[in-house]
Amino acid sequence: MGKMIYLDNAATTKTAPEVVEAMLPYFTEFYGNASTVYDFAANSKAAIAKGRQQIADVIGAKKEEIYFTAGGSESDNWALKATFEAYKNKGNHIITTKIEHHAILHTCEYLEKERGAKVTYLDVDENGFIDLDELQKAITPETILISVMAANNEIGTLEPLKEIGQIAHEHGILFHTDAVQAFGQIPINVDEFNIDMLSSSGHKINGPKGIGFLYIRKGVKIRSFVHGGAQERKRRAGTENVPGIVGYGLAAERANKSMKERTAKEIEIRDHMINRILTEIPYVRLNGDKVKRLPNNVNVSIQFIEGESLLLMLDNFGICASSGSACTSGSLDPSHVLLAIGLPHEKAHGSLRLTLSEEITKEDVDFVVEQIKAIVDRLRSMSCLLYTSDAADDL
């Protein structure tokens, strides 16, 4: 096997060398607990403050509105559970979508079963977009929160955050967005988009694992999620992960500075890959919108094959990809996202997600496409499905 070509950057990314270098002193040199009063802790306190500011700058927030967590899933749980508990006297209705990450969907299910919440799960169209008119119709006097992801982790669709936030605020409803995939990939301004809460995670932007944040707009009365000490202004207890915060702050700053140039390159390579796959492999459809999608996301459904078989054979060539989100790739169930956009089970099972990084070249993509073509031909020749033009449905 030659070099590895890593095309699963929606699952996680390689921590940038400069990020690792910045983190190291806070393991062995500046290791003081930031909650203590002696001078040795001053470096830790300063590092946390800097990381908080670096992240706030990316989304146009105030540094005191950034609360560090252990990752995107915790941030999503906090946003939904704590908001529900804080505002349940006003109402018990939450609006979200059928294509959210499981950190949102499973939290909503918990709130329904255990806390008496009523949740509306909005349908999406064939490209994964919500209907803003349907959102308006779903609002009731009991609605306290709208949670819609900024960018879908599987098909890359970019939801109309500004319009959603405007609708929410017109009705006096809080707006939360899961921006785990979008943060550092597309410009987001919390004031411009009327966002009250935003979740993100460090390891999606060449930062470390185990660190995330929840942006909470000043004035939002969200309750503490982890009880104990007085860290994070008494809203999230636990000794701060100083190395993680340092790394996350630098990764956020790095992603923001390189965003325009980096994403332009990713879009060029992404579109080249999409065009080759769609024109050179029959019975393939692109999942998600062709334009309003994450710069690095390619997701296709290939008829007459099983996606898991394709992944295993790609792995033999050193190509790392996914058939869906990493959180569900071990499951034989088809992606809930692909089912929500209208794909039947057999086509959802043939999905392939390829997510780029700044290190991926056009030559890498051309090599990958050639391997996909050869593997698809081989799998189709062995398929028990009738591979003829008469048997193929329109994708």
Which role does the model predict for each range below?
Residues 390-395:
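A short, hydrophobic C-terminal helix/tail in secreted or cell-surface proteins
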Residues 1-389:
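Pyridoxal 5′-phosphate
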